[in-house]
Amino acid sequence: AHKYTPTRYSQVLKNPYRDNWLEAITAELNALNRANALKHHKLIHTDRPITLKWVFRIKFHADGTFHKFKARLCARGFTQKAGTDYDPDRISASVGRASTFMTLLAVAAHERHHLFGFDVKGAYLQAKLKEHVVCRLPPGILATKDSDGLLVLKSLYGLRQSGYNWGQKFAKVLKSLGFHQSRVDPCLFTFHRNTDVLRIATWVDDGMVATSSPALWDELRLKIHAIT
């Protein structure tokens, strides 16, 4: 970790880059608000609140130059209770098989297809949470007169079921656009239009695209972006 990267919220206030970190925290809270991910909640005696943690990171470009200060509010998944806060049978993230990616590359090379990569920003926050999950207020979010906790409405990073929820959400989006999901690897999706073909292999919130038509990917990429 970078020496100026805080490991907890309290260290931010003493950090030489305090203002930059506070700006990153504000950006994260704004993103959570836009996604309607959290809602103020009055804790009651039957609630079993989990805890959240701020995670900080200084991001760099591939050439090593500075990119940005990043703050993310994550759930401490280990504080969740199986069967209550999540279904233990629905926690596997959508991770494509290594053989799927290797085959996709081999087919693309043989057919002279074009390759693209993508990542979905804030992917998990787009997936709704089915379970009733509440949490204690983390540093940076103040209590109100009527609330001393938070109701979690979306799949926060760190929740045991978030990766699974996002995978289900993204698969539904792709199938609504006409993609066919592979029965061999559910992280592989294929789209056909006339003589053109486009294949997507997903790895959680990242993906690789191989297509005979870059224009087709441009079109579908915009449609995916409009839905997600």
Name these PLM-found stretches.
Residues 1-228:
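Long, low-complexity, charge-biased intrinsically disordered regions
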